[in-house]
């Protein structure tokens, strides 16, 4: 089931136009607001914040930008499912699939079983952003426009979306293929972040240093790096710094609001290889 959110077209992060299209709608007169979103930005439309919960969630990583987030009530959110790109292909089920970028490494929605709702960060044609802002069962989902760095002589900058998921009282931000630290407009739209799923691969996206700058901006308690293939050199550069790092021998973890670290810590999930599934 494909759910198309309202679309918005604007020039690359011109502040007045960005606020007009993405922020002003949130300032309308609905009184319920997300715990994640900036308190000055109120969501519009009939979308309500899910009831507060404090259960444990599961985060499972399949490689690249492909995650499965499972709430304590069993709602499964799939992010950026990949096609054939060298990682093992999982058998995965989901209620909702988010697509941050229209590329075969991010939009293989047919892989996901269960007739999920599909939320695309870009309108058909790939050159306009969609504004996503809804509650599905116990999970609030909204997006933030980002740019990936393209090849200037051919593509220039490529549009995409990051997504925020509020579940079980936690604010989880999937940064998408972001190519530089966030500007003030984007930071306001992102809001509070507890868990950051952060791109670090470089070339077309931020690299290790850019990823660390985004940690400084968002101040999450838990950071899970992504989008670095099997490049351990990139990972070593990302973990070389002030943040405590944990290397897990599994591709999943469970956590809750009450068990988050007090200061930012990096959790490195296992990169799956053939034979691991």
Predicted regions and their residues:
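Short, basic, low-complexity termini and linkers enriched in Ser/Thr/Gly/Pro
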Residues: 1-31
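Core dinuclear metal-dependent hydrolase active-site scaffold
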Residues: 34-92, 120-191, 251-277
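P-loop/Walker A phosphate-binding loop and immediately adjacent motor/lid segment at beta-alpha junctions
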Residues: 51, 108-144, 212-228, 244-248
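Cap/insert and terminal regions of metallo-dependent hydrolase folds
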Residues: 180-273
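Glycine/Thr-rich phosphate-binding loops of Rossmann-like dinucleotide-binding domains
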Residues: 87, 106-108, 206, 233
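Active-site neighborhood of phospho(di)ester-bond hydrolases with catalytic His/Asp-centered motifs
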Residues: 78-81, 93-114, 119-121, 173-176, ...
